[in-house]
Amino acid sequence: MKFVDEAVIRVEAGDGGSGCVSFRREKYIPDGGPDGGDGGDGGSVYLQADENHNTLIEYRFERFHMAERGENGRGRDCTGHSGKDLILKVPVGTRAIDDETEEVLGDLTTHGQKLLVAKGGFHGLGNTRFKSSTNRAPRQKTLGTPGEVRSLKLELLLLADVGLLGMPNAGKSTFIRAVSRATPKVADYPFTTLVPNLGVVNPRPGQSFVIADIPGLIEGAAEGAGLGIRFLKHLERCRILLHIIDIEPIDGTDPVDSARAIVGELEKYSPKLASKPRWLVFNKADLLLEDELKEKVARVVKELGWEGDVYTISAYSRDGTKELATKLLDFIQSLPPEDKDANPDAEVEFKWDNYHQANIDAINEDYDDEFDDDFDDDDYDVEVIYQR
C-alpha cells in the first residue's frame, strides 16, 4: 500500500435540532398548555487512533466527512433524537492541525485514543421551557446551534525510539536491515529510500525497540533540494538520533562537510529536534585498514568538535551492529518513562452548556405582565403545530 503521511480533510459536525411549538389538545382538556419538546444535539466528529491503520491514503480520496444532524423536537414533550457521532479511524501517531489557524488540536499516540475535532450543535428548546406563572401559553422556541466546521490537516508522525540521519548512500537502510527484519530497498545510487521505514530491533530476548529510517538529506534540503525535509517530522518522537556517516564516500566528498551539512539542515528544521541526544556512527569501516580507519575517524571527530558518543560499524558485514543495538537498548531503558497522559475517555466541556439560558431570561424579563394572552378565549383556537 502506498505510504501517505499527510492529508487535508473537511469535517462538519451535525447541527442541533430545533425546539417545537406545540400545545396539548385532548378531549375535555381545553387549556392543556404547552407541550413542545426540545430538539436533539448534533453529532460530533472524533478522530480515533487505530493500530490496524498505517497510512492516511483513504483520506486523500474521501475528504468530506459529516456527522448526523439532531432531530427537531415534537409535540407531547417528545425530544428529538441526538445525531450520531462520526468516528474517523487514523493511524497511531497522527497529529491533527487546524488548516486555517495552524493550531495543533492534538496528537493521537496510543491505540484507542479519541480526539474531538468538531463539536455538534446544541439542541433548540421547545415552548414548554418558556412556560412561567405569567406566560402560560408561550409561543417561543429556539433553533439548534450550527455544528462546528473545520478544515483539518492530518500528519502521520511515525512512533519510533531511534531515528537514523545521514546523507544519501550513507548506509542507513543497510544498517536497519542488519539489526532488524525490515527489508528496505538497498542500491548504489542516491535516494534509494523514498519513504520512511520502520524496523523492530531485538538485542535481547523479550526486549526490543523501534528504529526509523528516513530518506537521506542533502545540503539545501530546507529550501527543497533533494526530497526536502518533509520526512524529518518522523524523527520528532524519537528518543535518540543516530547520525550515520560514510567514512569512505565513493564520490570523494569529505565526511566532515557531509556531517556539518546534516546538522545544519536539522537546525534549520527544528532546534528542538537538533537538541535531541545524538550519536555519531561511522559506517563502511570494512573499506579501510584498521590504522587508517582510526586516523580518519579521529580527524572527523576533532574537526567537528564532537564530544558525544562515537561508534564504528560496517552495516554490510554487520561488524559492530549487534553491540551498537545493545547499547541503544540500554540507553533507551535508562531514560525516564514518557509521560502518557492521553485519556481516551476524557470528557470535553460542552461549548454551549449555557447557550440558551440568556434567551430564556431575556424572554421572561421582557414579558409584559399586563398582557397575558393566556386568558383570551381565542388562545386555544389557534392552529396547533405538530411536528412528526
Swiss-Prot record:
Record's keyword terms, sorted: Cytoplasm, GTP-binding, Hydrolase, Magnesium, Metal-binding, Nucleotide-binding
Subcellular locations according to the entry: Cytoplasm
GO molecular function: GTP binding; GTPase activity; magnesium ion binding
Obg domain: residues covered: 1-159
Gene Ontology terms: cellular component: cytoplasm
Every OBG-type G domain range: 160-333
Domain of life of the native organism: Bacteria
Positions that bind Mg(2+): 173, 193
Cofactor(s) needed: Mg(2+)
Signal peptide residues on this chain, from the entry's feature table: none
UniProt-annotated binding residues for GTP: 166-173, 191-195, 213-216, 283-286, 314-316
UniProt-listed InterPro entries: G_OBG, GTP-bd, GTP-bd_Obg/CgtA, GTP1-OBG_CS, GTP1_OBG_dom, GTP1_OBG_dom_sf, OBG_GTPase, P-loop_NTPase
EC number(s) from the headed UniProt entry: 3.6.5.-
GO biological process, one term: ribosome biogenesis
Known partners and oligomeric status: Monomer.
HAMAP family the record matches: GTPase_Obg (MF_01454)
PANTHER family: DEVELOPMENTALLY REGULATED GTP-BINDING PROTEIN-RELATED, MITOCHONDRIAL RIBOSOME-ASSOCIATED GTPASE 2
Family note: Belongs to the TRAFAC class OBG-HflX-like GTPase superfamily. OBG GTPase family.
UniProt function note: An essential GTPase which binds GTP, GDP and possibly (p)ppGpp with moderate affinity, with high nucleotide exchange rates and a fairly low GTP hydrolysis rate. Plays a role in control of the cell cycle, stress response, ribosome biogenesis and in those bacteria that undergo differentiation, in morphogenesis control.
Entry protein name: GTPase Obg
Species this chain originates from: Shewanella sp. (strain ANA-3)
Gene that encodes the chain: obg
